[in-house]
Amino acid sequence: MSLTDTSPTRRPAVLFALILLAWATSSPHPAVAQTSAEGDQTPARLLAAAKSWGYQLHKFDPDTLAASPYDMLVIDYSRDGKPARALTPEEVDKIRVKPDGERRIVLAYLSIGVAQTYRYYWKWYWGWVFGVLSPRWLGSENPEWRGNYGVRYWHEGWQKIILGGENSYLERIVKAGFDGVYLDGVDEYVDMVKEKRNARALMIAFVKAIAERARVLKPGFLVVPQNAEALLADASYRAVIDGIGKEDLLFGDDVSQQPNDPKSIVSDVVRLKLLTADHKPVFVVEYLDAPQEIERARRRLERYSFIPYFTDRALDSMRVGDVPAPDHAADKK
């Protein structure tokens, strides 16, 4: 039933949703309170002040990334997921400088709820013979994304891979010089509730452990999860993260380019605005091709004070032309 339904049984819920959405669109840009100190270049303040971002995980070139205009980039730590082709600290430093000489934030993609077969940690025999040779933490393969396996992320074996020492995934990223991590697979807790009743709490604890370990290694290290916006209801979770990424907010939550259900959008926006109320940014990626849809989506996302980016779902190219003009932020006030 649409949000315009005025039947007596629906009217209170609809009115409440519209009030919440009005609040969501009236909140100030999260960067306002975060950038009061002139010239402050801490990673958290730079992230909060970002007006644009880009997202590419495959087929990237450091020179092309460095030439992009975005205030924040999310990339893989390696060209192919393996150490031999990992970006060097020198390459990361180059990417961190925009063409105009200004500093930008560079986050490394890190999947903490899904194991991927092209990663350095993967053993060729995992998943074979009905999984009898697989570690206990390895779940089933996602039929829609071949080579991606859900994980029991609370298991010591998986957590050791992610944050368990100098050869851990996290430490490789820190040593390469990234400003932070962009955590994917956080929403895996939804599927794991059937195995662990406290799967939600265990995921929050895992994200907190990653943040704590990373900031011991590198003070000010940024932690930005993707999706799982329902976790934002937990104030302690919001306190430990520096922002959030959200896929398919307006379009394509069924992996199409069709508009999402209006009620679902309202619900997600209200959750995401919990973070902007804490003066932390929300980065939205929409996988759209049609210029008219992109422009409409951009205007709507900017009304929410979210930072939009538009690209292909394969994430194997960097689109340009989505960067606002210098005075663009003023248009949103």
Which residues does each predicted region cover?
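Bacterial N-terminal signal peptides
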Residues: L15-S27
